[in-house]
């Protein structure tokens, strides 16, 4: 018995239960209609362990990627090596590079350098030869720098000048011996330089500028060819060679000038005679004007002109 006037109903609970179920259906339908196609499902419960592990792995991978990007190549290499040793074992000496066969650019140039490059040398060009050829092209090959330390053994060393030596004047305005900086009394010498390079014997004519003491060292065994300035001699020779030509040119020019003078004089004479004739004619005409009045001329009338014209036609 319930306390509402002593009345009770068996259908009251069923009606209340039916209304709540309808409300639930409406809410589910509304949620289905309002959900977007790209919207993720809502977890009303605690996430599964696998889902949580995947999220953690993804976050860790993102952090590791940012960490590796911040490193340079050497730091990444050391990190990977340390990780390999930590996870798989091994010794650190196994990862050390052997530097016995390492070569710098200077070593490559020393191995492949040539005092003079020929067309045959440029046939098969490797990257080492190209590097040596590039260095050779930057050298200045007018004067040489000499090593005269073993002049008593008749052994000399020659090399081309570099840009720094060209700017400072070493080898041209200063002595070409690498251990001498004398700049007075320099002489130019031409040396037939014989050398062996890459198993081949070659010769090259080399110019040197040396002081007196270094010239004595160069010519210790036999005298080399000295290069003297031939500008004055060449000038005197050219002047002597050109003198007969100059004389002939001067004589021909005099004859031409004489001919031109004669031509000018004759032309002047003709012009003078013409001017005289014109002046005489003008003076005659002026004198005739002042002699008296002009004679009267009878002008024919138009009829008389017609009569004369027709008379000539009918004759």
From Swiss-Prot:
Which residues are modified to N6-acetyllysine? 36
Q: Where is this region: Disordered?
A: 1-28, 225-308
Principal cellular location given in the protein's record: nucleus
Places the protein is found? Nucleus
**UniProt superkingdom:** Eukaryota
Keyword Acetylation attributed: yes
Give the range the annotation lists for the signal sequence: none
Single GO MF annotation? phosphatase activity
- Residue spans with biased composition (Basic residues)? 225-235
Q: Give the source species.
A: Rattus norvegicus
Spell out the GO cellular component terms annotated for this protein, sorted alphabetically and separated by semicolons.
nucleus
Keywords in alphabetical order = Acetylation, Nucleus, Phosphoprotein
Where in this protein does the record say N-acetylmethionine is found?
Answer: 1
What spans are recorded as compositionally biased (Basic and acidic residues)?
A: 236-245, 257-279
Q: What is this protein called?
A: Protein FRA10AC1 homolog
Please provide an example of a Pfam family that matches this protein in its UniProt record.
Answer: Fra10Ac1
Q: Please name the taxonomic classification of the source.
A: Eukaryota, Metazoa, Chordata, Craniata, Vertebrata
Subunit info here reads: Interacts with ESS2.
Mention one GO biological process in which this protein takes part, according to its record.
Answer: mRNA splicing, via spliceosome
Phosphoserine PTM sites in chain numbering: 9, 12, 251-252, 283, 285
This chain's function reads: May be involved in pre-mRNA splicing.
Tell me yes or no: is Flavoprotein among this UniProt entry's keywords: no
